[in-house]
Amino acid sequence: MSEKSRNIASALFPLGLLMIAMISIQSGASLAKSLFPVVGAQGTTTLRLVFASLILVAVLRPWRADLTAKSLRTVVIYGIALGCMNLLFYMSLQTVPLGIAVALEFTGPLAVALLSSRKPIDFLWVTLAVIGLLLLIPLGTSAAAIDLLGAGYALGAGVCWAAYIVFGHKAGADNGVQTAALGVVIAALFIGPIGVIHAGSALLDISLIPAALGVAILSTALPYSLEMIALTRMSARTFGTLASLEPVFAALSGLVFLHESLSLTQWLAIGAIIFASIGATLGSANSKPQLVPAD
C-alpha cells in the first residue's frame, strides 16, 4: 500500500468509527425516551451514566491511566461537560423533536470547527455543513411549535458538546480510551445527585434495568469509546466538522422509526453535509496528525 493510500485509509478509519457511534446514539435516544415517563430526563441520564460507567470501568480499566495534576483537571472538565451534555440533551427531548434537538445541539461542534479553522479550504467544508444544517432545520409551521425552553436546553447541550470535543481531544491524547471511562465516572458522580433528587426511589425499580442497560450501551459505553479513539486520530477541528453527520442520522432515524418523510430540500441538505464531512476527512489525510495509541 502506498503512503498516500495509507494516509487516506488512516483518515477514513475514524470516520467509520464516528458513523457507528452516531447510529448507536440515535438508537439509544429512542430507547431513552421510553424511560422519561417513569424517571424523567434527569433520572434517565443518571441511569445511563451509572450503568455506562460500570461497563467502561470493567472493560477499559481506567486505573491504568497515568494521571498528572494537569491531566486530571482536563479529565474532570471533560467528564462534567459530558454529563451536562447528556442531561441538557435529554431535557430538550422532553419538548423538542429529536431531529431539531440534534440540529440545535450541533451548534457546539460547528463552533469548534469554525474557531479552529486555519486554511481557506476548511471554510468551504464548514460552509457546506452550515448550508446543510440550515436546510435540515424545519422552519415554517414546525419551527413555530418549538418549545423555547427545550430549544435552550439543546443549545446548552451544544455548548457542552463543544467543551467535550476540546477537552476530550486533550485528555485522550494523554490517556487514550481510558479517558472515556474516567469521564463517564465523573459525569455519573456529577449528574447522579440531580437524578436522585428528581426521581428518588424510582431509580431502584429493577424492571428498568434492561432498558437502562440498553441506553447505557447504545448511548454512552459504545459510542463514547469509539469517539475517544477517533478523537485521538484527528484534530478537534476535523472532529467538529465530521460531527455534522449527527443531525443527518437523526433525520434518517425519524424516517425509519417514526415514518417521517423528507423533502427534496432535506435530502439535498444531507448530501451537502456528507460532502462536507468527506472533504474534511480527505483534507486531514494530508495534514498527517499525530496518532496516539489506543491501548
Task: Give the residues covered by each predicted segment.
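Hydrophobic/aromatic residues within transmembrane alpha-helices
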Residues: 35, 44, 48, 92, ...
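Hydrophobic alpha-helical transmembrane segments of multi-pass membrane transport proteins
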Residues: 19-27, 31, 59, 76-91, ...
